[in-house]
Amino acid sequence: MYVVNRKGEEEPVSFDQILSRITKLSYGLHPLVDPARVTQAVINGLYSGIKTSELDELASQTCAYMAATHNDFSKLAARISTSNLHKNTSSDIGDVASQLYNFKDNQGCPAPLISKPVYDFIMENRERINSKIDFSKDFEYDYFAFKTLERSYLLKIDNKVVERPQHLLMRVSCGIHCGDIEAALETYELLSQKYFTHATPTLFNSGTPRPQMSSCFLLRIPEDSINGIFDTLTKCANISKTAGGLGVAVSNIRGTGSYIRGTNGRSNGLIPMLRVYNDTARYIDQGGGKRKGAIAIYLEPWHVDVVEFIEIRKNHGKEEMRCRDLFPALWVPDLFMERVEKDQDWTLMCPDECRGLQDVWGDDFKKLYEEYEKQGRGRKTMKAQKLWFLILQAQIETGTPFICYKDAANSKSNQKNLGTIVSSNLCTEIIEYTSTDEVAVCNLASIGLPKFVDKNNKTFDFDKLKEVTKVITRNLNKLIDVGYYSLKECKKSNLRHRPLGIGIQGLADCFMMLRMPYESEGAKKLNKQIFEVIYYAALDASCELAEKYGPYETYSGSPASKGILQFDMWGVTPDSGLCDWDLLKDRISKHGIRNSLLISPMPTASTSQILGNNESFEPFTSNIYHRRVLSGEFFVVNPHLLNDLLELGLWDDRLKQNIIANNGSIQNILTIPEDIRELYKTVWEIKQKTVIDMAADRGPYVCQSQSLNIHMENANFAKLSSMHFYGWKKGLKTGIYYLRTQSATRPIQFTVDQQLLKSETKEKDSLETNKRQALEPEAQKLIACPLRPTNMKDDEECMMCSG
C-alpha cells in the first residue's frame, strides 16, 4: 500500500511516520487521547494511492468521530487539519495579502478580495504585523470551530483556502483600524485570545473592497403601493446579499378585500405580497452560499390579516398561504395583552381604513384604537383570547411567531425622542427607529465570558471585562464610519444615531466553571453584575468618544441627554458597587455619548462555536448531542461535565450510552453525585421562570433587547400562556424569540447499546416517575393564569416542526 506525497511521488505507507506526526500534535491533551490508537484507526481506513493531504483529512475525521470519548480528540482533529492548512498556505501576511489583492476572475479581470487601502496598510506594516501574529493559536480551535472557519470564514481563491485563522483575525483588525496600527494590533490580540469576536458579517467582509460589516437591518415599507412594496423588496435583496439579517414592518399594508383607489379593485391582502418576499429570501444567499438570506416580518395583532399571518410557516393548509422561508413576528401593544387577560373583545382593522395605529404607542395607541372601535371602522370583532390561542397554537407547531412588546420597546428606548419604533430585527434583540428615509442598522460583537473566569480561585475578572468592553465599543463605533452601505438610507440612519450591539456568549459556561447551578442565587447575582459592568463600560467608552468627537447627531432630547439611563427607565437602582454611576452620569451630562444604543445580547450560533462557548446567555440544551451546520455534523460532549466525570472516575462507555439514552440529561443517573447533577441541568430541566427572571434582571442594563428563547417539554396552552404573561408583566421588550419544544415521547435510539443499559432500567423507571411528579406543577410555579382554550386540551401533544 502506498501514499502519494505533495510532490506527486509514491511512498510506502508507514505506521511510524503517521504515529510520529499524530504524536507531535498531541501535546497537552488528555491521556485518553492515545496516538497509537488513533494511528491504527487511520491505517484501517487507508486505501492504496491516497494523497497525503487526503490522509490528513482522514486522520482528522477519524479523531473527530472519537470525540465522544473525550473532547481532546476534537482538538487533535483540528490540529491535524490546521497543520495541513499551514502546509498549503503562506505564513507571511504580505504574501497572503498579495494573493488576495491580485486575484483575477475566470475572465482574467482584476477582482481583488481585499481593498487597496487595507492592502497598502498591511504591506506598509508587514514586518511588524508578521512579528505579532501567533500561529500557535490556530491550534487552539476544536474540530467543529476549524471546519466552521474553513467552510464559511477563511477567504478562498478558486475554492482553495488561502487564509489561516490568524490571518482572518488580522484582516478583520486591519479592516476596522486601517491607518492605526496600534488599534489594529490591540484588536487582533484580544480576538486571537478569544476575549471577544466580531459578528459574522464583520468576519466575512472586513478588509474587503465592499466591507459591509453590519449584522442587522430594520425597514418599514414607506407606503402601501406597488412602488413602496417593491422598492422595499429591492432593498431587502441588496442588504441580504451582503450578509445582513432583516426585520420588516408591514402593519401599514392594507388587508384582504381593501379597496384600491388607483384601479378600482380589491386587495389580495398581506400573504400574497409576503410570498414575493419569501421567494426573494430563498433566492438570495449571503456571499456565495455562506448562509441563506433571512427576513423577519413584523405585524401588529390588530391587522385584519393577522390570523393568516401567524400561520405562514405551518406545514398544512393552503400552499398559496404559506411563506416558510420568512419568520413571522408580532409587535404587540399592551392593550391586546390586557384584553386577553380580561377575556374581552378584540377588533381587527385594516390600516388603510384605520390609519396611524402603527405610529403611536402607549396611551396614544389606546386612544386612537378605541376611537376607531367606537366609530365602527373595524373589519371583524373576535374574542382576544381566541386570537391568543391561535398564536399559541402556531408557536407550538412552528416555534413562531416571535413576540415583542411594542410599549415596553418604545417606553424604554433611548431613541424614543426620534419617533415610534415599529419593529425589531431578525433575531428580536435590536430595537431601533426607522422611517421612510432611514433603514436602521446595527453592528454587533459578543464577549467570550469564560475568558474572564479564574477557575482556580473561582472568581470573575470584572476589571478585564470593562477593559475589553471599551475596546469593543470603540471598534463598533469605528465600523460605522468605515463600513460599506448598500443603501443611502442605511448610511443616513447609522451616521445619525450610531447604535451598537454588544452581546455575550458562554454565560452558562461561566456558571459551570464557577460551580454555580444555573438556578442558583450566585448565578442570578453574577448575571446582573456582568451586564451592569458591560453597560457601564460601554457608556464610559461612548462618553469618551463623545468628548473627542461630539455626541451623536440626534442626542439632544434623548433620555440620556436628560440624565435618564436604561436602568432608570426600569425603575432600578444599581447596587453591586462595581461601577461609579454618579460619576459617569456627571460626565455624560457634560459630554454626551457617541452612540444612541449599546447593549443587545444576540444569538451567537456560529461565533460561539468558533470560540468554543455555549450560545449567548442560554443554558446548555443537552450534555451530549450532534451539532449540524453548513460545514457538517459533529459530536459534542459538554466539556465541563466530561472533565468532572473523569476526575470522579465515572466516565466510561456505559455512562456515555446512559447519557445518550437519557437524551443528554444526567438527572436520572444516580451514580453521578447530586451536586454534579444539579450543576449540569439542561435547559429542559431548568424552570423557564428562572430564564425569564434572569432576562428581566439583566434588562435594566440592556438598552436594546435580547434574543430570548423559551424551551418547553410537552408545551400546552396553559404553560405557554403563563410564560408569556409572566414575561410581559416583568417588563421584557422581547417576550419570545423561538419557542423550542420537545415531546415526552422519544424516538427509538438505534445508536444506543441497550445491553449496557438493561441493569439500570429499574432505577431509571423510578427516577422518571419522580421527575414527572416534580415537573407537573411547572405552570403553577410561573404565574396563576386563568386562560384555557375552548378547542384544545391542555395536554395535547406538541406538533412543532423545525424552527
From Swiss-Prot:
Disulfide bonds join 216-442. Under complex allosteric control mediated by deoxynucleoside triphosphates and ATP binding to separate specificity and activation sites on the large subunit. The type of nucleotide bound at the specificity site determines substrate preference. It seems probable that ATP makes the enzyme reduce CDP and UDP, dGTP favors ADP reduction and dTTP favors GDP reduction. Stimulated by ATP and inhibited by dATP binding to the activity site. The record marks 798, 801 as: Interacts with thioredoxin/glutaredoxin. The record marks 737-738 as: Important for electron transfer. Residues 1-91 form the ATP-cone domain. The record marks 216, 442 as: Important for hydrogen atom transfer. GDP binds at residues 215, 425, 429, 604-607. DTTP binds at residues 224-226, 241, 254, 261-262. The keyword Iron does not apply. GO terms for biological process: deoxyribonucleotide biosynthetic process. Heterodimer of a large and a small subunit. This is Ribonucleoside-diphosphate reductase large chain. It comes from Cryptosporidium parvum.
